[in-house]
Regions:
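Accessory "access/gating" subregions that flank catalytic or transport cores
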Residues: 118-158, 305, 311, 319, ...
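Flexible inter-domain linker/hinge segments
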Residues: 74-134, 277, 281-299, 307
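Ferredoxin-type iron-sulfur electron-transfer modules in oxidoreductases and energy-metabolism complexes
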Residues: 2-7, 21-37, 46, 53-71, ...
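Hydrophobic alpha-helical positions that pack around
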Residues: 111, 213, 217-334, 346
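Short acidic, glycine/serine/threonine-rich loops at helix termini
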Residues: 19-23, 46-51, 143-151, 175-178, ...
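Short amphipathic, charge-patterned alpha-helical segments
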Residues: 192-194, 333-350
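Histidine-anchored nucleotide/phosphate-binding helix
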Residues: 185-199
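Gly-rich Lys/Arg/Thr-decorated short loops/hinges at beta-loop-alpha junctions or inter-strand turns
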Residues: 105-115, 166-178, 271-276, 319-324
Length: 509
């Protein structure tokens, strides 16, 4: 009797594809194997990762196929589920990661898919809202606003037309959880949006995806078509962004969906009251909405609320990136420390050099030194430390990093990405670049814009000292933090001032 072909599971996640997964899959198919393309386990340093009967091999190349099949490969990592990186996690949002085919409805249903929506539709909208509120779920996009309160506001708002909008404009450096979820488990996001629609009375949903995610866009469109009868009468459409970082801000995003320039709106009114096309709108990010199906499953809200610490409830998919040995996605309850994340789980730097800084929360997050790695990963602790959790991105830098240059980059990034509507962000970021350059050069460069301004007759004639420039930088940071219309200008001071505080030696003498 002819033996059945070996079934090989290989991710079709964008990162795996970039690492050569298609070539590895083709080599296994040529060797007579049945190849299944599944979602990513999130162990990015091992991609392309090959799974055969639960055993993992990686990073694999086409040349490794023969050794893997005959059992002599040196790239075996044992059972994937038992690997310390996976076994130590508390996966709820990413419970299906590595285990299912992304656009297989059969796989989704076999892993409790649609259970949350089925239960939600057997409940009243008020009961669903109470369940989400009781779970303690907060927005995973950075603001950390309680999801239940936002939904309740939309539900209570007058009007017959309401919308659910998913912010999938994942523009922060070092973040990839949204992309992984959309590419690996799109039905879960769709289910979460359908539950939100039932709770607030919305009939239409939009997923706003950045144009740099073509694989995610294709997976979402395929999944939406397959899920149409499951979520009806609710409808979902994908809208593609044009690359503006500021469109990750909810009101800029709404303008973009409406076909307008991606520009921040003044608040009030809040989008929950006057959002898309002037109608009450729920705007949540991918991870927030993807957490909903579990919460609405039987007993899910109570269990979800039991995880985490104080007001930071549930789990957070943390993304380990930058100069780190074991980069990838690690989902765990709030409260874990940076030391655990970077050193125990991440394995330290990929370069082998000492860790100098970690930036948490994307390009607008504060730089945290090793002396503060004891901080628990939760919203309140980071707020007290003048830092941000943001979208859960953790980017590692070794001791070769120039923190003065990183501070300058924060201002330059803000200047390049500003929508231009408010003065503190538009002008402050440009002045910030000039000021950092002046401080780092010891005031020896050409006169900056401030010095070039017309001077009052009674202005002091002495040039600005380093102390003057540092005070001016602090004043500028305060103005941007409290005067900007959105977080782009408002959060730029976090990386700048944290770099100056902890590494003054990188700013010159």
């Amino acid at each position: 009797m002819t033996p059945s072909p070996t079934t090989v599971r290989i991710s079709d996640d964008a990162l795996a594809l970039a690492c050569g997964a298609d070539g590895v899959a083709a080599a296994f198919a040529a060797a007579g194997c049945t190849v299944e393309r599944v979602s990513s386990w999130g162990m990015h340093w091992l991609e392309p990762l090959v799974e055969i009967d639960g055993l993992g091999f990686g990073p694999a190349t086409p040349a490794d196929v023969t050794a893997i099949l005959d059992g002599t490969s040196s790239k075996s990592i044992g059972r994937i589920a038992d690997h310390p990186f996976i076994a130590g996690q508390q996966r709820l949002t990413f419970a299906r990661a590595g285990r299912t085919r992304p656009t297989s409805l059969a796989d989704y249903i076999a892993t409790a898919g649609w259970a949350g929506l089925t239960r939600a539709r057997a409940m009243t909208a008020a009961e669903v809202l109470a369940e989400v509120t009781a779970s303690g779920l907060r927005g995973r996009g950075g603001a950390g606003f309680p999801a239940g309160i936002k939904w309740q506001t939309v539900a209570n708002a007058p009007g017959t037309r309401k919308y659910v909008v998913c912010n999938a404009d994942e523009g922060d450096s070092g973040t990839f959880a949204d992309r992984m979820l959309m590419e690996g488990d799109p039905f879960q996001l769709i289910e979460g949006m359908a539950i939100a629609a039932h709770a607030v009375g919305a009939g239409q949903g939009y997923i706003y995806v950045r144009s740099e995610y073509p694989h995610a866009i294709a997976k979402l469109n395929a999944a939406i078509a397959l899920a149409a009868e499951h979520i009806a009468p609710f409808r979902i459409e994908v809208r593609i962004g044009a690359g503006a970082y500021v469109c990750g801000e909810e009101t800029s995003l709404l303008n973009s969906i409406e076909g307008k320039r991606g520009e921040v709106r003044a608040k009030p009114p809040l989008p929950a009251l006057e959002g898309l096309f002037g109608c009450p709108t729920v705007v949540n990010n991918v991870l927030t909405l993807a957490a909903i199906p579990h919460i609405l499953s039987e007993g899910g809200a109570a269990f979800y609320a039991s995880l985490g610490v104080e007001r930071s409830k549930g789990t957070m998919p943390i993304q380990l990136a930058g100069n780190i040995k074991h980069g990838g996605l690690y989902e765990t309850a709030f409260g874990i420390t940076l030391d655990d994340l970077v050193n125990r789980i991440g394995g330290g730097t990929a370069s082998g050099r000492p860790v100098k800084a970690v930036q948490v929360g994307g390009p607008l997050g504060a730089y945290i030194p090793p002396a503060q790695f004891h901080l628990p990963f939760d919203y309140e602790a980071y707020t007290v430390a003048d830092a941000l959790i943001g979208h859960g991105g953790v980017t590692v830098f070794d001791d070769s990093a120039d923190m003065g240059a990183m501070a300058r980059f924060a201002f330059a990034f803000c200047a390049a990405e500003s929508c231009g509507k408010c003065t503190p962000c538009r002008i402050g970021s440009t002045r910030g670049v000039e000021l950092i350059d002046r401080i780092r050069s010891g005031g020896k460069g050409a006169p900056d814009a401030v010095e070039s301004l017309p001077q009052m007759h009674n202005a002091r004639k002495a040039g600005r000292t380093r102390a003057d420039d540092l005070q001016l930088l602090e004043d500028l940071a305060e103005t941007m933090k409290f005067g900007s219309l959105c977080a782009l200008g408002g959060f730029t001071p976090y990386p700048v001032m944290s770099a100056l505080k902890h590494w003054p030696e990188d700013f010159g003498e």
